[in-house]
From Swiss-Prot:
GTP binds at residues 118-121, 147-149. InterPro entries: Fe2_transport_prot-B (IPR003373), Fe2_transport_prot_B_C (IPR011640), FeoB_GTPase (IPR050860), G_FEOB_dom (IPR030389), Gate_dom (IPR011642), GTP-bd (IPR006073), P-loop_NTPase (IPR027417). This is Fe(2+) transporter FeoB. Pfam families: FeoB_C, FeoB_N, Gate. GTP 1 binds at residues 8-15. Probable transporter of a GTP-driven Fe(2+) uptake system. Seems to be required for optimal intracellular infection of macrophages, to be important for growth and/or survival in iron-restricted amoebae. It also plays a key role in extracellular growth under iron-limited conditions.
Length: 751
């Protein structure tokens, strides 16, 4: 077996290459002692097994105790500590000179290295030609030109790993005699301490460049003190010598012609990064994403809903009736498992549309600019602009967004990002929005969704601002970001990335929604006295009693006593937000007897025909929905007979529904999010997030509902608005003074 490390600069296509090499044969875990994700994969080449470990993206192997993220520290330590046979160094052919800096450091390890020269097609498009044979000769290692996103050059790279045994010699750097003597002395001292010759050479260079995390602490500190006494700026001298050597190599192997794409990028950036137009363009892009997801994705939603309802709910119920199964079995299978499958599959088109648009923004190069644009606004409030990059990931799922905060250098910025990320509307929340938009906002539903996403962003910023003024005081670290050139992503790549994200989401949602629907169906079938009902909802069921008991707590935000399924949805949503849709769909169906199946009413082919017929019908209304959302009407004539119809009767109109959506947006994160907050921060931060999000959600929903209904009952509304305002101020005061101890404890834990 051959074990190879995959390393390269950020945004060099390393992850794309890792996926191309290993396909689905991947494992994800954590590096020992830290929470940084560790990805390994393998593939067979004939009968030879090759294992790949994907290291975090880094610009340099120098690991300093201050100003380095966990990702960078892991990469720097892994090249020393792990047992491996060779290194695959991924280089962006468009930025050869900058990427060879890391290559020069890797050569000093004395290990076999294969250079994967990626994005050759993009380089050619930009007028860059590279003589790979001459580059291979000058570096002294294999150089394989590849296009990872098109799987071009991958077989040649795989073959090179079979013959990767030649140890690489370091590049010869032009240093002064005095500087070279100091490095030789360092190397000899390390050898006398028991280090192998190759590691002694490598460590001496890292120490000279200011690395404080390698070797024995006491010994390396003494060497660093001696270095400071030499009055030689070895780190600067080494960096200058590296760039000088790299420039010589690049001059010999690279030719650059006129680059039309650079001119196009520069012209477009004048508009996209304009001082006054940048933020409006950013919000316009976000708005287009929700417009695309709700209208384009929503056009196919009825197809998935009707077809899966016909097959898994009505079909399974009809089949069990033919087998004379008991009513409780029919209820559990049809309205439990069947309704769970129906719920999971129904919101696939909306989620897929959003993932597709996100992938388009990311691969085109705009998303990096979005972080740059938002940085100025966030830094004005003392918040780190870098936080917005992980927070954008939160539009898909809050869990990876919080985990992505590991890439931030500052501990303060990392904790701020962890606490702000749960307010970003994840794709599971989008599924809930889509259901309510169909029931209550058939015209201009994308405007409703956009407002919710915007409120989530504003609440995240507000939370960060409060933390900056209390627990996490300090200055925001500067944003250093590489802005890639704009390019047109291939449809194949967009579909592949959308498919990968969608499969993960559906798998995660399905394995939660289906069991929850079965459990809810069981609780709804069991009466308080221990009997079994026929499967229809009744006021004596355990679920009904629990829901009715808790519902009065939510009365100020418009949830009335007969709308107890909405309360149960909030409770199950604490497990996972995608479960809310399954809960509402299951309970409202049983309350309204929508799930009752009879042999006389079941028409399989009629249901399938109606499902296919919904696609052209919805697409024909797409133009009016996009260009004239006010006059467009998507009201369904059969809405009153469906779950949507039951929902519209139970909620207090559009106002009550929007108040409910505000609570869903802001309240307690799901179990997975809470767990990762505890993992990335500590228990106190987790509980702070839970309490803060619940208070903010409740206060915001109540204030909105009471404000909207102010004319109906002005005195009652005024009391509730004042009460919520005072409660929020009280929590802020408690938060300010009680968090001081938490901040000190956390600071101590991280020193």
């Amino acid at each position: 077996m051959t074990h190879a490390l995959l390393i390269g600069n950020p945004n060099c296509g390393k992850t794309t290459l890792f996926n191309a090499l290993t396909n689905a044969n991947q494992r994800v875990g954590n590096w020992p002692g830290v929470t940084v994700e560790k990805k390994t994969g393998e593939f067979l080449l004939g009968e030879h097994l090759i294992e790949i470990t994907d290291l975090p993206g880094v610009y340099s192997l120098v690991a300093n105790a201050e100003g380095i993220s966990q990702d960078e520290q892991i990469a720097a330590q892994s090249v020393i500590d792990l047992e491996y046979d060779c290194i695959i160094n991924v280089i962006d052919a468009c930025h050869l000179e900058r990427h060879l800096y890391l290559t020069s450091q890797l050569f000093e390890l004395g290990k076999p290295v294969v250079v994967a020269l990626n994005m050759m097609d993009i380089a050619e498009h930009r007028g860059i030609s590279i003589d790979t044979e001459k580059l291979e000769s000058l570096l002294g290692c294999s150089v394989i030109p590849i296009q990872a996103h098109k799987n071009i050059g991958i077989p040649a790279l795989q073959q090179s790993l079979l013959h990767c045994s030649q140890k690489i010699k370091p590049l010869k750097l032009s240093l002064s005699v005095a500087a070279q003597q100091i490095l030789n002395d360092l190397e000899n001292q390390l050898i006398s301490k028991g280090y192998k010759n190759s590691f002694a050479y490598y460590f001496s260079r890292r120490l000279a460049e200011g690395d404080t995390l390698i070797g024995e602490k006491a010994f390396t500190e003494s060497l660093l003190i001696k270095l400071q006494e030499t009055e030689q700026n070895l780190d600067v001298l080494l960096a200058d010598a590296r760039y000088q050597k790299i420039h010589e190599i690049v001059t010999l192997v690279q030719k650059k012609h006129s680059d039309a794409s650079e001119h196009f990028t520069a012209k477009l950036d004048k508009l996209v990064l304009h001082r006054f137009l940048a933020l409006p363009i950013f919000f316009a892009m976000m708005y287009l994403m929700f417009l695309f997801a709700i209208n384009i994705g929503g056009a196919f939603q009825d197809f998935f809903d009707i077809s899966t309802e016909t097959i898994f709910v009505q079909g399974s119920g009809w089949l069990l009736q033919q087998l004379h199964a008991p009513n409780w079995v029919i209820a559990l299978v049809a309205n439990g498992v069947g309704k769970g499958i129906n719920t999971t599959i129904t919101f696939i088109p909306v989620i897929a549309a959003m993932f597709f648009f996100l992938s388009l923004l990311e691969t085109s190069g705009y998303m990096a600019r979005a972080a740059f644009v938002v940085d100025k606004a966030m830094r004005a409030m003392g918040l780190p602009g870098k936080s917005f990059v992980p927070m954008i990931v939160g539009f898909g799922c809050n869990v990876p967004a919080i985990m992505a905060a590991r890439t931030l250098d500052s501990e303060r910025d990392r904790l701020l990002t962890v606490m702000m990320s749960p307010f970003m509307s994840c794709s599971a929340r989008l599924a809930i929005y889509a259901v309510f938009v169909a029931a209550f906002f058939p015209s201009g539903g994308h405007n409703v969704v956009f407002s919710l996403y915007l409120i989530g962003i504003l609440m995240a910023v507000f939370t960060g601002y409060i933390l900056r003024k209390t627990t996490l005081k300090g200055h925001a670290s500067p944003l250093i970001l590489e802005l890639p050139a704009y390019h047109r992503p291939s449809l194949r790549r967009l579909l592949r990335e959308t498919s990968l994200r969608l499969r993960f989401f559906v798998y995660r949602a399905g394995k939660l929604i289906i069991p929850i629907c079965v459990i809810l169906g069981g609780l709804n079938a069991i009466t308080w006295g221990g009997g079994i009902s026929s499967g229809e909802a009744n006021t004596d069921s355990l679920l009904s009693i629990i829901g009715q008991w808790i519902t009065p707590l939510f009365a100020p935000m418009g949830i009335h006593q007969d709308n107890w399924p909405a309360t149960v949805g909030l409770l199950t949503g604490m497990l996972a937000k995608e479960v809310v849709v399954g809960t509402l769909n299951s309970l409202y169906a049983q309350v309204g007897h929508v799930g009752e199946i009879t042999a006389a009413h079941f028409d399989f082919w009629g249901g399938i025909k109606a499902a296919f017929g919904s696609i052209p019908a919805n697409l024909s209304e797409l133009g009016s929905a996009l260009w004239n959302p006010v006059s467009a009407s998507a009201a369904d004539s059969e809405l009153s007979q469906s779950v949507y119809g039951i929902m519209s009767r139970r909620f207090d109109g559009a106002v009550g529904a929007y108040a409910y959506l505000l609570f869903v947006l802001l309240y307690i994160p799901c179990v997975s999010t809470m767990a990762v907050i505890r993992q990335e921060a500590n228990k106190r931060f987790m509980w702070t997030s839970i309490v803060w999000s619940f208070v903010v959600a409740y206060a915001t929903s109540v204030v909105f509902y009471q404000g909207a209904k102010f004319l109906d009952h002005p005195q009652q509304s005024m009391v509730w608005i004042l009460a919520m305002s005072l409660s929020l101020l009280f929590v802020l005061a408690v938060f300010r003074y009680s968090q001081y101890g938490m901040g000190r404890q956390n600071a101590a834990a991280n020193t």
